[in-house]
């Protein structure tokens, strides 16, 4: 191998690990399985290509359950989170690609145990793959452009002995943007996007085309105001059910108008967002963030159209704790590369769960109107770390006229998810941590006919564990978890619950 080849090879880093877990589950409630042990093997391979070179690949490939005895039909639970970027033509043509595979749930109205050894017919293997070629460049000193073609596929597979899975969907989003920045942050932006959604069931596709012009004015270095206007043309296909077509195809076109602002009162505080009027009413996206030396706070409020593959791509596994730690460490570690390494080290040392609680992304045949509010915070101390989040997310299927679909064709999809979660880690010694987590979520129907029985569901997951380093490359943990699910008001047999005791050993190669 040449010296250049050696240099390139050294940029790639692989990290393999393998583990074994033994779990004893005690079940309470009607129609529950017998108590028993479940033994599982797991494996993972981490890939990090570094930031140099034209091809960058980062992420992990593995299985949370590679081989199990007992459990839900000797289940296989893959876990993949990969991102790749190829600079095909220097500083001009790029290709982004992602692959995410994890275990998820069909409906928020069903049981959602976080412990994979607790069986449920609501669980399936969710897969999301995307390929996005794009070009970008500068055509004048202050004018830049981007043309991007996002392609997202969401195949799925059943988990264990359950037959539940979602149809394969496809989303294409062709978007272009040209913008200019002048003065202290003012300027203009031209945008166009054409989104096409194939739900994998109906023969037609949903098409949404939007063109916008945005003008911004910098009042001062801290505040920028903007006005936005445009036009949209949408096409919704006919929806079909058991008895044929239930809702004819529809189309809509109209003017878009609105405004927004970006406000930076201090270097640690930011308020950004916009409001628009569209065919379904108000559309908005507001974000508030603030950081202290050890704390990162964030609040988000959104309302707009969305699709199942869109959400599967943007939030495949929940809100990551790493992004909050990155903000909290910004003051102490200005360099982004060193800060990323510090975040990874902190997560490894504390054993803090990598994600915060978030609403369940579930399959839906139509484009939906999503209205979401969330508040999150992460505190990173010397011996303690704490993360919490609260969320409320309302989902409504809508027609091309902007009104809600009749309940007969909503398939139980219109609902409101409300919940929250807290993660806590305490360092007992240099090699041992106490970790605890609790997540509670309530799902309610938002119409009188979209959900069988018109019931709500309650899901509660919690665990506490002690993690320790047994050897330089070997770690172990013991823990206790509890899960309960019930549907108040339904004609069921009461709540069900599971208490689990487990022990895990993991070795890094």
Residue ranges and their predicted role:
Residues 2-509:
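Gram-negative and organellar
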